[in-house]
Swiss-Prot record:
It comes from Corynebacterium urealyticum (strain ATCC 43042 / DSM 7109). Binds to DNA and alters its conformation. May be involved in regulation of gene expression, nucleoid organization and DNA protection. Belongs to the YbaB/EbfC family. GO terms for cellular component: bacterial nucleoid; cytosol. The keyword Cytoplasm applies. Keywords: Cytoplasm, DNA-binding. This is Nucleoid-associated protein cu1912. The keyword Glycoprotein does not apply. Gene3D superfamilies: Nucleoid-associated protein YbaB-like domain (3.30.1310.10).
Amino acid sequence: MSQPNMNDIMAQAQRMQKQLQEAQAEIVASSIVGEAGNGKVTLVLSGGGEVQDLKIDQEVVDPEDVETLQDLIIGAFQDANQKLQDLAQEKMGPLADLGGGGLPF
């Protein structure tokens, strides 16, 4: 069995780098919606992890129970963050398996 030559290895590395950059661009361009309280609190994260929007249904705003509202906001953020991580894994995960093990990144 012959060893791959340096040109093949470099071409593979360049393809992988391009695919990685494309996957990163897709993730950054995404908006992820997280929800809590059956949609009473929604939070939108950018693909870069920044909060873009927060909506709170008036029904869950109770001055006597601020703690519940805080929990709902945290829950919506955690939901959006998990979805963002899942998206990143979906887009970037396959890149680690390219080329019979790929290159370490």
